[in-house]
Amino acid sequence: MAVVVVNSATASLLAVCLVFMAVGLCTGQIVDVKFPSCRCERELTPFAIKSAATQLTSRNPGVVNLYCFEIGIVNSGSGACYTEPASQNLSKVSVYAQAAQRDRLSAFGVLLAGAPVSNMTYLTPRWDSLNMTTISNLNFSKTQANGTRICLELFKPTTINEFCEREGASGSFCWVALFNDNNCVPPNSTVVISKRLCCPRFQSFLSP
């Protein structure tokens, strides 16, 4: 069993989930959370987060833990967020985090598919007021994104179970959202959006 993608449009999300299940990317509990807090469509794009997160050896094992989410590709889908040219690149990744844990995040890591952990690129995390921590300007094609890992470097003894926000839901998982654009227009903003913004989100569980 893997993950579920959810918002208030439960029927639509269940349909999306069935597509993900076909490639081993979707399962779990149907819940709704206030993430991401952006005016964007939480529908299927060519990109997904695999359900099993992993812990890798960190660059400083005595000080930090390293937890990673792997990007997968959905090879069959429909709808504007899947088919439009603007959705064929992955621009941004966000993780839903607990406000009290902000100072526990040392860095984001990006590990390209097939590369050794020693080749990890470390980036300074960016936060917004809605408990999203984000890396942007990725501009990954499907080929570049497939198998790439997005990692959280957390100061010990913090684990991703403690770091991630679940809004009271049971289970040990993180919410991760994938965006086709760097922008996050707040839900109540009256700004006119000139392109379709897509932001499916996924639950990813730490493997034993």
From Swiss-Prot:
A Pfam match: DUF3707
Going by the UniProt annotation, this protein carries glycans at 89, 119, 131, 139, 146, 188
This molecule's function is given as: The sexual inducer is a glycoprotein synthesized and released by sexual males at about the time they release sperm packets. It is one of the most potent biological effector molecules known: it exhibits full effectiveness in converting asexually growing males and females to the sexual pathway at about 10(-7) m.
Instruction: Give UniProt keywords alphabetically.
Output: Glycoprotein, Signal
Q: What protein am I looking at?
A: Sexual inducer glycoprotein
What is the species listed in this Swiss-Prot or TrEMBL entry? Volvox carteri
Please state the span of the N-terminal signal peptide per the UniProt entry.
1-11
What InterPro entries does its record include?
Pherophorin (IPR024616)
